[in-house]
Amino acid sequence: MFFIHKRFRMLYNMHMKIGIYGGTFDPVHMGHIFVARSVKQELGLDSVDFVVAADPPHKHSAERTPAALRFDMVCAALKRERGMRASDIEIRRGGVSYTVDTLREMKRINKKAGLYFIVGADMLEDFPKWKNPKEILELAALVAVNRRGQERDIEALADGIRAEFGGRVEIISAEGPDISSTEIRRRVQNAQTVERLVPLSAEMLLYEKRLYQPKSIEQLAERVSNVLDEYRMRHTMLTVREAVGLAQYHGLSTEKARLAALLHDCAKLGREETVRYAEKMGYALTNEERENPFLIHSRIGALLARDLYGVQDTEILNAVERHTVGCAEMTPFDEVIFLADKLEPSRDYRRIRDLRELAFRDLDRATIAVLRNTIEYTENKGMRIHPQTEITIAALEKRVKARLHGGD
């Protein structure tokens, strides 16, 4: 049986068509995915390998994300893409990577398969200057992807390459999203959302690993990570992601939202430590709060944000303080941080998809719905409901009613 299976694999490999898509992927984005899908469909490829560069000759940057992290993001992005996989062939080889070296190794691994090396059409102009261009075309067909309407200019370049080096040059026109990795990095650094520009699983990873953030946020996140455990820090960074998206959609300060989200759980210190810090700061605790310090971590967090992390902005401090059970005077900014905490993408509970959609339509109604969901969960666990929860709901319902009836 093993013999038949092995023979089948060998026969299959003889007829396989494999796309090779190289790049730094710093980070991988939906433009990359669209190109791979288009080429795969157009040429009938069996698979596309995303070859993550260690040090490609045409891109040098001291600020480049470590190869292992870029590879992990590509793996995450391709998890649900059929017939696509990440390759660390250049990373394992190390040093400066040339296309011809990668194709030699790919051909050694896939002796009978047809290889298709995928590039942006803008790279055709410099192709004759690449290392061993003739051998590249002996090892693989060159597939140039360009935007529709540029076919004539690209075809002339392709004809020149065919005439000089022989081999096969394919041109594929695709009208995908106009995205660059540079733009993704810039947006993250400037606290702008990259939702739908980067595959969600890769986007989550870039936030978890705190990539592309400004130096001040990197340093603050490092301080916070020294206090929180790994699980809580992951949640914190994904709350940052959600807060930035909600704030941007609702026209609020995304930079403030990023900072508030980063500090929202800075007092999740454990029961004894939370109580000890509260007493040190002169905060009078009720018996209920002593028994359940999680009820006050948001209030203590606001004190820590001010006294330990140097935040003086009242809007940020209020949002940190109000992110657990809210208050009657919740502002839209408060609601963004509250909702980001409850709806960040690692959360998974009943109705969360509907709640996320509602959060982008109506902050008040989404906050009410999440609070009611919290009450249901708390009651099912046999725990007491914080009295502020009902006060917050009543105030927000009154506000929604006034808004719907024009204030009458």
What residues fall within each predicted segment?
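Nucleotidyltransferase catalytic core that binds NTPs
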Residues: 2-216
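Short helix/strand-capping connector loops at secondary-structure junctions
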Residues: 179-191, 353, 370-380
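N-terminal leader/targeting helix
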Residues: 96-106, 110-113, 266-296, 384-386, ...
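Charged phosphate-binding loop/patch that engages nucleotide di/tri-phosphates or the phosphate backbone
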Residues: 193-217, 376-408
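Divalent metal-dependent catalytic cores for phosphoryl transfer on phosphate-bearing substrates
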Residues: 222-226, 235, 244, 249-371
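Alpha-helical structural context
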Residues: 42, 109, 164, 227, ...
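Residues at secondary-structure transition points
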Residues: 61-69, 93-97, 230, 234, ...
